[in-house]
Design a protein with these regions (language model features):
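Conserved core of the sugar-phosphate nucleotidyltransferase
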Residues: 123-201
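Short catalytic helix/loop segments, enriched in acidic residues and glycine
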Residues: 37-52
């Protein structure tokens, strides 16, 4: 249950303040030259940077404990620290390890905590939602040239597992937003403690691979977001589709 503290910030009855971690260390190799001198988090949709929109939504939801894990183009994030009450955690090994390493750096924080990919585009403030279980946002989307992690759910929208899809049809896939509670965090920490070093260095490795262990042992819910409210930037085709969504649904409202 969410309540309000004396300062107006949201917290759960267990005494934990809601917080957020944004993972933004990756290079974004599929964008080639476009990400050579720019982190994907700094791409603009309309006139707003992706990372700024995430931060603004978090602040509007009353979440003040915000950490950004940086790596590629780390120096560019300093301007955000000047303008917003955020913490910066530099993953110095971002070029050597996959994003499992970024997750390991902040896993101790994942108790009543939002976990967000820095390349997740949002047109709606989803951070005002309250969940009783660890919850992963999902969306129907096409792979668009990149493998996607398909979410397997039961009739109650509990996540049962995942598999990789490289086809052309739309599938229910993970969006880069999740809300973590203590039970799932403990399983994740245990899984990370047994992870072999070579798995952290595998180029195509992703922290979502660890979710199989989490969903086996605790209840994790899926929350499907309509495609008009956002998306993630895995490929150039994704970017083009998100721009089209913005132009169709949101451009006239944000003038």
């Amino acid at each position: 249950m969410i309540e309000k503290a004396a300062d107006g910030l949201p917290f759960f009855t267990g005494g934990f303040y809601m917080k957020a971690v944004i993972l933004a260390a990756g290079v974004g190799h599929r964008f080639k030259e476009l990400t050579k001198y720019k982190n994907k988090a700094f791409f603009t949709i309309g006139q707003t940077m992706v990372i700024k929109q995430i931060i603004q939504y978090l602040l509007q939801a009353g979440i003040r404990d915000i950490t950004i894990v940086t790596g590629h183009r780390h120096e560019d994030f300093s301007i955000l620290k000047k303008n917003y009450p955020i913490h910066i955690l530099y993953n110095t090994a971002y070029g050597e390890y996959n994003n499992i390493h970024s997750l390991a750096l902040i896993a101790e924080q994942l108790n009543e905590c939002w976990l967000i990919h820095g390349d997740t585009v949002l047109f709606k403030n989803i951070f005002k939602e309250a969940f009783t279980h660890t919850t992963f946002y999902t969306m129907l989307k096409r792979p668009n040239g990149a493998p996607v992690r398909v979410v397997e759910v039961d009739e109650q929208h509990h996540i049962q597992g995942f598999h990789i899809d490289r086809g052309e049809r739309r599938v229910l896939s993970l969006l880069g937003v999740s809300y973590w509670r203590k039970d799932a965090q403990m399983i994740l920490l245990e899984t990370l403690s047994h992870l072999h070093e070579k798995e952290k260095k595998r180029f195509d490795g992703e922290w979502e691979e660890l979710l199989q262990e989490v969903v086996k042992k605790v209840e994790v819910d899926a929350y499907q977001l309509d495609r008009k409210y956002g998306g993630d930037l895995n490929t150039m085709k994704d970017y083009q589709e998100i721009v089209e969504t913005y132009d169709r649904y949101w451009k006239s409202m944000r003038k």
